[in-house]
Amino acid sequence: MFNVQRNMYDVQGNLREVLSRLPQGVRLVAISKYHPNEYIEAAYAEGQRTFGESHEQELRQKHETLPKDIRWHFIGHLQTNKVKYIAPYVTMIEAVDSLKLLREIDKQAAKNDRVIDVLLELHIAEEETKYGLTPDALRELMAGGEWRQLQHVRICGLMMMASYVDDEEQIRSEFRLAHSLFDEIKEHYFADAPYFCERSWGMSHDYEIAVEEGSTMVRIGTTIFGPRVY
């Protein structure tokens, strides 16, 4: 119990430190996957309300037991057959990488009589394990136009992960490419849509660079909660 209590104080101090580094207009998604409810409650007590999870079952369990005003973002790769389990309550699905997934989110949101905000995930990083749409695939999806018929999803922006490397210039160039793609999509398809405004990039190791390169939403876990408990 002593260790849990001590770590809860650490979480609160870490959260305050991160928030002090974020300029006005940049929002924090506290990535709480694999962390115990006590840590989320500690961050909640400090005023944090937006948390990110990447596993449907873990998210369901946390949603059932934690305060209902928490805004849950789903940040992981989401299988279409799992959408129905989170559709009733999820605030945003950040990692949409196919028209098929968009259709399923729309279908399940309609069943729950709500509109679900989503971000389209870009694949810019060099790692092969990263999911997401290549720049050309993103352009193709948008040009196809079927997304316009989906009444229960709202595309609010783009999300991406930079390469996990020490080369700051490479990281910066990937964020800049993401920003230019955001501007391109905004101009062509969402010029009159103020809700298309989110640029979700930047994690514990690169969020300060991400903010410099136009991020509006950073996803930070380890810096706040410490190493994950698997």
Model-derived features: positions:
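Conserved alpha/beta-domain cores
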Residues: 2, 6-205, 213, 225
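Gly/Pro- and small hydrophobic-enriched strand-loop and loop-to-helix capping segments
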Residues: 215-230
